[in-house]
């Protein structure tokens, strides 16, 4: 996969793309990252990328020309059209399902806005508009980092154990079960006996119940579109009966 980021602040991505899972994915050749300062594509003497809004109002608007030219340069040799993602608070809220969808692509281009955002005509380039929450950030850079991380970790070979991505919270439609490691007793807080039993069927049942319990208690909205198995339905009924 190739990921390009159009931004006025490329240095913001150095630590993120050069650390942890994203760096490992890059080192393995699974993904390549490129940050592009779209100021370099501004067709004016002073490399100006913004201007006053027509009709008046506060703030400055990012001009379309540098973005169009930068995207053109990034896609001129491509055989397949990339997904061009604008980060903006008006966009579709990012989700695990969206991350899985984007992980199937060969090329992603992130457009990171600033100031009052992009000139509306930039949307003619865009395939997706994404947000990471109902709040406003200074720019799209942090959102691009979040989405890139959520996508890359789903690529085959990125995680040490591919099952890790499958069992993460939201991947199954539910919140993940609790995790424990050594010691078995830490300051009087003990690991549940079932996890020490070595009985794999009972452990899986415990994890299933804990996952359903957490989802019911913390994110019951996730259960609205969830289709439980017969066993999960029985556990859910028992948990809901206890709540009444």
UniProtKB/Swiss-Prot annotation:
PANTHER family: TRNA (GUANINE-N(1)-)-METHYLTRANSFERASE. Specifically methylates guanosine-37 in various tRNAs. This is tRNA (guanine-N(1)-)-methyltransferase. Its EC number is 2.1.1.228. The gene is trmD. Pfam families: tRNA_m1G_MT (PF01746). Coiled coil: none annotated. Keywords: Cytoplasm, Methyltransferase, S-adenosyl-L-methionine, Transferase, tRNA processing. GO terms for biological process: tRNA N1-guanine methylation. It comes from Shouchella clausii (strain KSM-K16). Belongs to the RNA methyltransferase TrmD family. The lineage of its organism: Bacteria, Bacillati, Bacillota, Bacilli, Bacillales. It is an enzyme of class 2 (transferase).
